[in-house]
A protein has these predicted regions:
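C-terminal non-catalytic interaction modules
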Residues: 1-13, 17, 186-276
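Structural signature of alpha-solenoid helical repeat junctions
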Residues: 9, 46-51, 86, 90, ...
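Residue register of alpha-helical TPR repeats
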Residues: 12, 51-54, 93, 131-133, ...
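Structural register within alpha-helical repeat arrays
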Residues: 17, 52, 57-59, 98, ...
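Structural motif corresponding to the intra-repeat A-B loop/turn of tetratricopeptide repeats
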Residues: 24, 64-66, 105, 143, ...
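Amphipathic alpha-helical segments of tetratricopeptide repeats
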Residues: 35-42, 75-83, 116-123, 154-162, ...
Length: 276
């Protein structure tokens, strides 16, 4: 919306103030403040369709409007921004919000349809694409459709890595690994092959493809130095995944390192496995 603060209009500057207040949780009189911005964005003197769409989206998400109108309002924002600035970060954010609303309303398939409109080839920024793929993967898990879930986790991880979003990449990798360890096969296609050869399927056709051990090893080798910086904590399911990977791949090094540092581990379940 604003290339630089020096080019911003007074309305756009106030819009940035609204965004900062929301991010900081400073919501006192936020309904009145946002309504003022909305009215200004529609006025003859300060008309700004981008600001109008952003304010309407924020007001819907904050529950300022009638709850029965939230979905309609978010859809309006998507359509307006598609016409104004398709493929931008703001358009992608609007799509993400609409997809999340559908999911929270129990409409998983509709959410996936919206997520499918967030694409790098349409211009959407990589971070938005990554967040979309991560959320879509989680929806596929709830539908027990695990092949596309694994592909979307992998795609999300790649987007996050290219955008240097290390925390998000860690999350996507762990969620992928949790699925991958269900079945590992030397004859299974690797993830790059699965992404390259993915094809449309019949709706509701759940699928499962085992993971390739090379992919599992790649992920664990990425995760291991990060997860083992600090082994404390009484609920370390992430370390449990490392141990499972070590056993399944019959690659003892990871487990041996954990045994050497067993005094640092607090999770009783992890301790039981390492001491057995």
């Amino acid at each position: 919306m604003v290339d630089s603060i020096g080019d911003a209009t007074p309305l756009q500057i106030d819009m940035l103030i609204l965004q900062k207040r929301i991010s900081q949780g400073n919501l006192e009189n936020i309904a009145e403040f946002s309504e003022g911005l909305l009215n200004r964005s529609r006025s003859t003197g300060e008309r700004d369709h981008h600001v109008e769409a952003r304010v309407r989206m924020d007001r819907a998400l904050m529950g300022i409007i009638d709850a029965n109108l939230v979905g309609t309002e978010l859809k309006w924002c998507v359509d307006r921004l598609n016409a104004l600035c398709s493929g931008t970060a703001l358009h992608g954010l609007a799509l993400l919000n609409l997809a999340n609303w559908h999911r929270n309303s129990g409409e998983s398939i509709m959410s996936l349809i919206v997520h499918a409109d967030i694409r790098k080839d349409l211009g959407h920024p990589e971070d938005i694409v990554g967040l979309s793929r991560l959320e879509a993967a989680r929806i596929y898990v709830t539908l027990n459709d695990l092949d596309p879930a694994m592909r979307h986790f992998w795609s999300a991880r790649q987007s996050f890595q290219r955008n240097k979003m290390s925390s998000e990449s860690l999350v996507a990798s762990l969620e992928w690994l949790d699925l991958a360890l269900e079945e590992v096969s030397d004859s299974a296609p690797d993830m790059e092959n699965r992404l390259a050869n993915a094809a449309p399927r019949e709706t509701g056709e759940a699928t499962w493809i085992p993971s390739n051990p090379k992919d599992v090893k790649l992920i664990v080798e990425e995760l291991f130095p990060i997860l083992t910086r600090d082994l404390s904590g009484e609920n370390r399911n992430d370390i449990g995944l490392i141990i499972d990977s070590s056993d399944i791949l019959q690659f003892s090094l990871w487990k041996e390192i954990l045994v050497e540092r067993i005094d640092e581990i607090q999770d009783p379940n992890v301790l039981d496995v390492l001491q057995s």
